[in-house]
C-alpha cells in the first residue's frame, strides 16, 4: 500500500525537511504476515526509468521511524539513494502485539521484508540494496545481512 505524504499531514519531517526529496508512506508484509510501516524517500532529480541503489534505515530501540531513521533516510536520499525508513514490528506504524515487544529475529526479518519491497520498485537497482541500523537496529541490520545476500552493505550508528 502506498500513500503520498504531504508536509501538513505527517510527522515524517519532524527534524529535517528537504526540497530535494519526495516522500511516500508505504507498508508491506513481513514473513509473519505483519504489516511493516515505512517512509519511502526518493531524490526529486530522478529521471523516468532511472534506477538507483537503495538503503533501508532502522530506528533506535524505543523510537520510531519519524525520529532518527527519517533524518538519515532523507540525508541519504539527498545524496542520490532511494531510502526506506522502517518501523520495526511492534513499533510505530507497524503491526504486532503486544506493542513495543523486543524480538530480534522478527526485526531481522523486517529488514529482509524491506528488501523484498524495494526489489519490486522499478526505480531501485536490485543489486545495490544496503542497510543503516541506528542503535539497536544496528545489530538487526547485521543479523539480516548475515542471512540475506541481497543486503550488499551495512552501516551501524551507535550500535549496541
Predicted regions and their residues:
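The serine-hydrolase catalytic nucleophile loop
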Residues: 62-74, 88
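Primarily recognizes the serine-hydrolase "nucleophile elbow" in alpha/beta-hydrolase
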Residues: 113-160
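Active-site glycine-rich loops that stabilize anionic/oxyanionic intermediates
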Residues: 52, 59-64, 135
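Glycine-rich "HGGG/HGxG" loop immediately N-terminal to the catalytic nucleophile
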Residues: 67, 90-102
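N-terminal cap/lid segment of alpha/beta-hydrolase-fold proteins
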Residues: 4-50
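Conserved alpha/beta-hydrolase
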Residues: 75-95
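Structural cue for short, hydrophobic secondary-structure segments
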Residues: 57-60, 85
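Alpha/beta-hydrolase active-site loop
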Residues: 68, 101-122
Amino acid at each position: 500500500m502506498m500513500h503520498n505524504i504531504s508536509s501538513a499531514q505527517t510527522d515524517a519531517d519532524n527534524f529535517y525537511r528537504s526540497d530535494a526529496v519526495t516522500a511516500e508512506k508505504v507498508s508491506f508484509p513481513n514473513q509473519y504476515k505483519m504489516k511493516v510501516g515505512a517512509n519511502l524517500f526518493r531524490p526529486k532529480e530522478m529521471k523516468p526509468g532511472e534506477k538507483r541503489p537503495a538503503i533501508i534505515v532502522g530506528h533506535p530501540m524505543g523510537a520510531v521511524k519519524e525520529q532518527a531513521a527519517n533524518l538519515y533516510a532523507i540525508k541519504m536520499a539527498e545524496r542520490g539513494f532511494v531510502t526506506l525508513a522502517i518501523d520495526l514490528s511492534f513499533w510505530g506504524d507497524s503491526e504486532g502485539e503486544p506493542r513495543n515487544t523486543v524480538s530480534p529475529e522478527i526485526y531481522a526479518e523486517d529488514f529482509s521484508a524491506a528488501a523484498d519491497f524495494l526489489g519490486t520498485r522499478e526505480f531501485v537497482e536490485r543489486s545495490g540494496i544496503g542497510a543503516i541500523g541506528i542503535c539497536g537496529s544496528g545489530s538487526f541490520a547485521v543479523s539480516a545481512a548475515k542471512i540475506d545476500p541481497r543486503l550488499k552493505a551495512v552501516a551501524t550508528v551507535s550500535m549496541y
